[in-house]
Amino acid sequence: MSSPQAPEDGQGCGDRGDPPGDLRSVLVTTVLNLEPLDEDLFRGRHYWVPAKRLFGGQIVGQALVAAAKSVSEDVHVHSLHCYFVRAGDPKLPVLYQVERTRTGSSFSVRSVKAVQHGKPIFICQASFQQAQPSPMQHQFSMPTVPPPEELLDCETLIDQYLRDPNLQKRYPLALNRIAAQEVPIEIKPVNPSPLSQLQRMEPKQMFWVRARGYIGEGDMKMHCCVAAYISDYAFLGTALLPHQWQHKVHFMVSLDHSMWFHAPFRADHWMLYECESPWAGGSRGLVHGRLWRQDGVLAVTCAQEGVIRVKPQVSESKL
């Protein structure tokens, strides 16, 4: 599945869309809205198509929507583990088949298969748990970063990039294409680098993110599904950051995706997405991520491995 990124780099200022104001989030009403066909069988539509492929985050989010419809109201997802096994066809709807693997008193497991052309393109297992108190609790400390109110959004950053007289000629077309796309999430990078000065960077990035529009407090299951969508955004691109000054992306897709849900949160409120890549090699990259609430609570942990094939970066002086 495709993993969106900024033009020829891995930073999380990829795409934007016009905010719907006070309207209910388009992620809930359209992007993650499934059509029930039969018991435990659903059809998804309304696909965002970056790089002519289905966006992996949308498939993960829709699969979790399907799984959540088969469990009781008093249980919530605590983990999911997914594999992308075939490229999705953006011209066709996706069928989601849910298997009720186990329903227990505390934990329940659901297996979800996403199907096109009669073959699975994606498989997922999600585990749900009833809320339970525990005296054993700890978490890492949230990174200290500027609040989202002090940072520029991607729309403003793209305008600044396009006005930069030192911007390399290969970027304006890609930036204008990005600016024309509509994406149902808002992004504010913590430390965006100028595109005119590609340089070696640490395989780490942070950005504030939230769903556009209003989701509300009532449905925690939907907030988890929206977070699943958000979690794949520019995630794998973190592995590119140390290499973007000498290589450009030839091919990049997600192989798998895992998430662990720790605490309640609202996906329509700002959360800090902390991403890092501890390893890359063998035409693969590994990335880890943490979604933090603004009050410092660790809400979600993510991990992903993907295929990354690159070509040498050709300087404009050699063109």
UniProtKB/Swiss-Prot annotation:
Location within or outside the cell: Peroxisome matrix
Entry keyword Hydrolase: yes
Record region (Disordered): 1-20
Enzyme class: hydrolase
One GO cellular component term noted in the UniProt record for this chain: cytosol
Gene Ontology BP annotations: acyl-CoA metabolic process; alpha-linolenic acid metabolic process; bile acid biosynthetic process; dicarboxylic acid catabolic process; fatty acid beta-oxidation using acyl-CoA oxidase; fatty acid catabolic process; fatty acid derivative biosynthetic process; long-chain fatty acid biosynthetic process
Metal-binding as UniProt keyword: no
Predominant place of localization: other
Free-text function comment from the UniProt entry: Catalyzes the hydrolysis of acyl-CoAs into free fatty acids and coenzyme A (CoASH), regulating their respective intracellular levels. Displays no strong substrate specificity with respect to the carboxylic acid moiety of Acyl-CoAs. Hydrolyzes medium length (C2 to C20) straight-chain, saturated and unsaturated acyl-CoAS but is inactive towards substrates with longer aliphatic chains. Moreover, it catalyzes the hydrolysis of CoA esters of bile acids, such as choloyl-CoA and chenodeoxycholoyl-CoA and competes with bile acid CoA:amino acid N-acyltransferase (BAAT). (Microbial infection) May mediate Nef-induced down-regulation of CD4 cell-surface expression.
Family from the record: Belongs to the C/M/P thioester hydrolase family.
Pathway(s): Lipid metabolism; fatty acid metabolism
PANTHER family (alphabetical): ACYL-COA THIOESTERASE, ACYL-COENZYME A THIOESTERASE 8
Summary of activators and inhibitors of this protein: Inhibited by CoASH (IC(50)=10-15 uM). Also inhibited by cysteine-reactive agents.
Active site: D232 (charge relay system), S254 (charge relay system), Q304 (charge relay system)
Subunit structure: Homodimer. (Microbial infection) Interacts with human immunodeficiency virus (HIV-1) Nef (via middle region); this interaction enhances ACOT8 Acyl-CoA thioesterase activity and occurs in a Nef myristoylation-independent manner. According to a second report, the interaction with HIV-1 Nef occurs in a Nef myristoylation-independent manner but does not enhance ACOT8 Acyl-CoA thioesterase activity.
Protein name (record): Acyl-coenzyme A thioesterase 8
Cross-referenced InterPro entries: ACOT8-like_C, Acyl-CoA_hotdog, Acyl_CoA_thio, HotDog_dom_sf, TesB_ACOT8-like_N
Keywords: Fatty acid metabolism, Host-virus interaction, Hydrolase, Lipid metabolism, Peroxisome, Peroxisome biogenesis, Serine esterase
Organism: Homo sapiens (Human)
Tissue: Detected in a T-cell line (at protein level). Ubiquitous.
Pfam family, any one: 4HBT_3
CDD domains for the chain: Thioesterase_II_repeat1, Thioesterase_II_repeat2
Enzyme Commission code: 3.1.2.1, 3.1.2.11, 3.1.2.2, 3.1.2.3
UniProt catalytic activity: choloyl-CoA + H2O = cholate + CoA + H(+); chenodeoxycholoyl-CoA + H2O = chenodeoxycholate + CoA + H(+); acetyl-CoA + H2O = acetate + CoA + H(+); butanoyl-CoA + H2O = butanoate + CoA + H(+)
